[in-house]
Each structure stands twice: as C-alpha cells, then as structure tokens.
Amino acid sequence: MRITIRDIQQMRDRGERIPMVTAYDYTSAQIADRAGIPLILVGDSLGMVVLGYNSTVPVTLDDMIHHTRAVVRGTQKALVIGDLPFLTYTSPEQAMQSAGRMLQEAGAQAVKLEGGVHIAPTIARLVQAGIPVMGHIGFTPQAVNQIGLRVQGRRAAEAQRLLADALAVQEAGAFAIVLELVPAELAQAITERLRIPTIGIGAGAGCSGQVQVWHDMLGLYSDFLPRHAKRYADLATIIAEALSQYASDVRNGTFPGPEHSSRMDPAELAAALGSQDQATE
C-alpha cells in the first residue's frame, strides 16, 4: 500500500524526520522504494544530471511525464511527486492541465511547483481539484536566471518575505513545502511556524525532513557537487572500474566464458551446416 500525504503529516506530527530523494528511472525508483524512502521526487533536476543541460529551465512537461512514468512503475510504497517544469503553470488554468497530465498520464500521486505568495492562488485551485501539491520556496532553480544561485533569506526583509511565502503556500493547501538554500536558523523558524512538513535542501537540520539529489549523494554526477550535498557513495568510480574490467575481458578473450554461453548438440550443428553447404554447391 502506498504512503499517503496523511502518512507524511503524521510523521511530522510525531517528530519523525522525513527522508526524500530524487529518482528519474525505474531501476533507481525500485532501489529507493526497497530502502524504505517514503517520498520520491521526480525532480526537474533531471535536466542537469540526466539530460546534460546546465539548468532546469529547458526541461519540458513531456520530459517529466516520461521519467515520472518510469519511477511510478518502479515503486510500490513510496509517494511519488512529479515536478511541474518551467513555464507549465503560468496560470491556474495551465497549471491544472499540466498537473492533470502528471497524475493521469504519468501516475504521480502529487506535484511540486515553485513559488510563494504569487503562486498560492494556483496551489489553491489545484488542491480544490483534488491534486496534492508540494510547495518550494527559497532558492527556486527555475528562476536561476533572475535570482542567481545563492542562499535566500539572509537579510531581514528577505526572511520576512520567505516566511510570508511559506504561510501563503500552507494556507493555499499544500501538504508540504521544500525550503532550498535558506539559512538554517530561518528554516527552523519557518518550520516551527507551519503546521505542514518542511523538506530542507541546504536549509539545515531544523526542517521536518531532507531531500537529496540521487546523483549527488551517490557520486554519479561529477560536473558539480553542491555544498549542501553529502556523498554517501562513489558509484561513478565503482562503475568505471567495472566497465574497464569488462572492456579488458572482451579484448583479451576471457569474456564471455563457457558459463555465459549456450551449447548445441554437435550432431545438430553438423546436420545444419551440412544441409547449408549442400544448398550452396
């Protein structure tokens, strides 16, 4: 049985920290699900770590639906959240269409979108239509060309704006909210003032939960490692060593071995080749 947004709220109410990771394909989703991760985000971060873009801006809704479908097929328990990418929720009507596709075509159980006070009416419309929404404030990657890649909320005026954003997103009906690149003290203060869970990324330990990007935490993305990412494994090195060994085995003829091949009765082979040879004479 899948985890629900009610389960996530109960985790928060019990003081249980909530882990969330990104996943972008069937196999990764299976692994995360088996590991007991309750929230899986199909993030538009796939634009960088899977598709090779330098930001999330080029990612399309079709990209997101394609990858979300795969993640949903790979999970049985985790609640799967699909990001709405850049310029797919510029109005409540467009957001409804985009989120509807994410749930109906991709099978996601919820969507995530970026923004605070200005996006709250859109969140409210989605929630009223029965679409669970996770909010996202602080550093919002889709606005990187406007705000730059920097911590948000260090100054009092910025901090007040972020608190207002968080409260607006909550009152609009979001079931949780991501706080990205927010000072730890501010993130904790926001968390204490909200009724819904906060999921931090680069926002300190005072949030209700944490999210990490799959490729960052497993050492699969070498282009850039954010300060807030913790590398739990160096899978890129392990994979490269395995591929190098495979290439060596092929070149020196040790792979495939007899145990990797099928055999044929010699008499059957002789009969087949004999018939072929006669036909070509």
From Swiss-Prot:
Cofactor binding note from Swiss-Prot or TrEMBL: Binds 1 Mg(2+) ion per subunit.
Residue sites binding Mg(2+) per the record: D44, D83, E114
Reaction(s) catalysed by this chain's protein: 3-methyl-2-oxobutanoate + (6R)-5,10-methylene-5,6,7,8-tetrahydrofolate + H2O = 2-dehydropantoate + (6S)-5,6,7,8-tetrahydrofolate
GO biological process: pantothenate biosynthetic process
GO CC annotation: cytoplasm
Residue numbers binding 3-methyl-2-oxobutanoate: D44, S45, D83, K112
Region (Disordered): 251-281
Domain of life: Bacteria
Pathway(s) served: Cofactor biosynthesis; (R)-pantothenate biosynthesis; (R)-pantoate from 3-methyl-2-oxobutanoate: step 1/2
GO molecular function: 3-methyl-2-oxobutanoate hydroxymethyltransferase activity; magnesium ion binding
Main location: cytoplasm
Location(s), subcellular: Cytoplasm
Stated family: Belongs to the PanB family.
Subunit description: Homodecamer; pentamer of dimers.
Biological role stated in the UniProt entry: Catalyzes the reversible reaction in which hydroxymethyl group from 5,10-methylenetetrahydrofolate is transferred onto alpha-ketoisovalerate to form ketopantoate.
NCBIfam families (UniProt xref): panB (TIGR00222), PRK00311.1 (NF001452)
UniProt protein name: 3-methyl-2-oxobutanoate hydroxymethyltransferase
